[in-house]
């Protein structure tokens, strides 16, 4: 009987483990803090993309950082990204780093090996997204995989080769489900002792 219960619990925990392994969770996100295009978050000049926000009004929501409360009036900086190539409306950019602050201290850092930028003057969505992404920071869990981020652009001003935009942001990752496997082992061990 105990063996049957152990198998049932292990199966349920294994199913939860498999389900969580396939689902990404939002780590941090924010809505566009700019009231209009006169206060952009990003600028592109045909050779580089620069960005950041130091004005008020950016609330960084942190559902995937349990030790970090949502941050009102957050700021961020980004290293300048140089253009590697242009293919129509898609621009491939160098890697870089984005740092989010609570006004003083670093709370969330994104590093990436490269990025793509779709220019905001064609049909469809316009965004900036990184690849080979890694999240870090003082309270960022170290057991994340498949990290990803994207900025969705709005309020473009300028031309396709020289523009500024405002943006909203989201980031996601798949939490490492190793803790669920440990729970399964503990549950089986607990049933064996009874």
What residue spans do the PLM features occupy?
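RTX-like calcium-binding, glycine/aspartate-rich low-complexity repeat tracts
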Residues: 2, 25, 181
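Acidic, glycine-rich flexible loop segments
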Residues: 95-96, 100-153
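Sec/Tat signal peptide C-region and signal peptidase I cleavage site
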Residues: 17-25
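Bacterial N-terminal signal peptides
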Residues: 10-18
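A short, hydrophobic C-terminal helix/tail in secreted or cell-surface proteins
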Residues: 175-193
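Bacterial N-terminal signal peptides that target proteins for export
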Residues: 2-9
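N-terminal segment immediately downstream of the Sec signal-peptide cleavage site
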Residues: 24-92, 153-173
């Amino acid at each position: 009987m105990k063996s049957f219960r152990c198998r049932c619990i292990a199966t349920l925990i294994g199913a939860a483990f498999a389900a969580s392994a396939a689902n990404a969770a939002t780590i941090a996100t924010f809505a566009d803090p700019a009231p209009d295009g006169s206060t952009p978050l990003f600028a592109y000049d045909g050779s580089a993309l620069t960005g950041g926000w130091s004005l008020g009004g950016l609330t960084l929501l942190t559902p995937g950082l349990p030790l970090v409360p949502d941050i009102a009036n957050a700021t961020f900086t980004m290293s300048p990204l140089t253009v590697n190539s242009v293919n129509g409306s898609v621009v491939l950019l160098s890697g870089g780093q984005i740092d989010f602050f609570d006004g003083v201290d670093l709370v969330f850092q994104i590093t990436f090996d490269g990025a793509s930028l779709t220019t905001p003057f064609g049909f469809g969505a316009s965004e900036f997204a990184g690849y080979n992404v890694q999240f870090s920071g003082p309270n960022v869990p170290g057991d994340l995989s498949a990290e990803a981020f994207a900025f969705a652009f709005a309020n473009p001003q300028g031309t396709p080769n020289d523009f500024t935009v405002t943006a909203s942001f989201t980031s996601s990752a798949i939490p490492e489900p190793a803790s669920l496997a440990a729970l399964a082992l503990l549950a089986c061990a607990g049933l064996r002792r009874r």
